[in-house]
Amino acid sequence: MCKRGDIYSVDFGNNHDSHKQSGIRPAIVVSNNKANANSPVITVVPLSSRVWKRRYLPTHVFIPFKKESGLDRPSIALAEQVEALDKKCLGEKIGEISDETVMEKLTIALQIQIGAYSEYN
């Protein structure tokens, strides 16, 4: 069973004519573990390794390079591109985010994205 904080290889399809992330890339599972265990749908946030080319947004969360993440370099979680997917789109598990502080920052970024903080509206 996949769990919140796991990093999977995900097929985001072909979005070449848009600014959305596309192709096969890592993503962090952000849906709650009860939903992850019981639903055929999972919620993920795509990652980008282009940390130096991205303009900072309050929905971006830096993911440091750590062995347990399974990533080969630092990345940015793009919470503004949060997406619900069929679990069939998940590839292999790459690693996990074990740092609670990073997951807390990602939760806040998701709240900002959905307008939970009036200062960003």
Label the predicted regions.
Residues G13-D17:
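Short, charged beta-turn/beta-strand-edge "cap" motif at the junction between a beta-strand
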Residues K66-N121:
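C-terminal terminal-subdomain/extension
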